[in-house]
Amino acid sequence: MSGSSVVALCLLLVSLVACGGRTTADPVRTEVQGVLDRRAAAVLGHDRSAYARTGAAASFDHLDAVPLAAWSYRVTDVDRAGDTATADVELRYRIDGYDQGPVTTRRTLRLSRDGADGRWSVDSDRPAEKSGQQPWDQGDVRVVRGAHSLVLGVGQSTEALRGFADLADRAVPAVSDAWERGWARRVVVLVPKSLEAMAGLLGSPASSYRGIAAVTTGETGGREHAPADRIIVNPDAYGLLGTLGKQVVLTHETTHVATRADTTAATPLWLSEGYADWVGYRDSGRTPPRPPPNWPARCPRAGRPRTCRPTRTSGSPPTRTSWPAPTRAVGWPV
């Protein structure tokens, strides 16, 4: 073999090794990400025409009233079949004035490519498997602002949502008076159309929440840049309550929001629910109709809850003598 041939062969081998070490970008994934970047910009810019140029536009009208501080997509996977594709996507958004960090939810998008210009467009956008719906997945979102609250409703009148805002605005000062430790002193309330719609937001069967007037969802542990907790109302059960009961429910759930930063995996349910009940009924002249789950016999059913201290149980970390909120989602039954 001549010297020039050896040199050429070595250069070929080097180039092959170098190429093998590179990760080639998926052009379809890159194109889909570009479409979704334009879609996100249209949402934040309230530009329906620009949104429609990226594909199906019905959802734009559903969420147009929601006060958004951030909205973005991240494509995690694309499965292409000819001129169609299915994309796994993370949607991240923040509600202005309430979310310190983004809500992150998984979505499944179906797209198609125009044969004329080769551009991809969104045909459908739905929650991924085992992910809950967002309010705008269920229809047009109406928004009512209170002094200490933001109420988002679907299938509800503005008058009804104003009633929820008024209740929440009374709940926040009542909770702050009982729980003086730092919290945002504002709440987000979601009011869907029905029990089934509530279950859709939570990504769970409706049977799990039948008879539950409301639940509060949020991250445990008090992460600094976390999304705001959501109080999610079951309108079917909530509508059966009287004036006092409705106020107690919102105050009870707001207590969970306020105490969220002190939540740990060791928090007993009776402790978090007992304190929330105490705050809910505190100024009503009434006592809760029944004790929370696993309420200890040694604890009084009236008076200040601090007269009943949690005890340490064998094999578990000590429970707090402050009164933290429950983990994830806990509801107030009718």
Which sequence ranges carry the predicted segments?
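Secretory targeting and sorting signals
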Residues: M1-R22
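Short solvent-exposed beta->alpha transition segments
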Residues: T24-Q33, D37-T84
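Sec-exported extracytoplasmic/periplasmic mature domains
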Residues: D37-L44, A56, D169-A184, T255-T264, ...
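Surface-exposed, charged secondary-structure patches
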Residues: H62-R106, P235-G239
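Extracytoplasmic
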Residues: G82-T84, T104-R106, D117, Q138, ...
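Short beta-strand edge/turn micro-motifs at domain boundaries
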Residues: G97-V141
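Juxtacatalytic substrate-recognition/specificity segment
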Residues: R145-P268
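Acidic/His/Gly-enriched intrinsically disordered linker/tail segments
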Residues: G218-E224, L244-G245, T263-P333
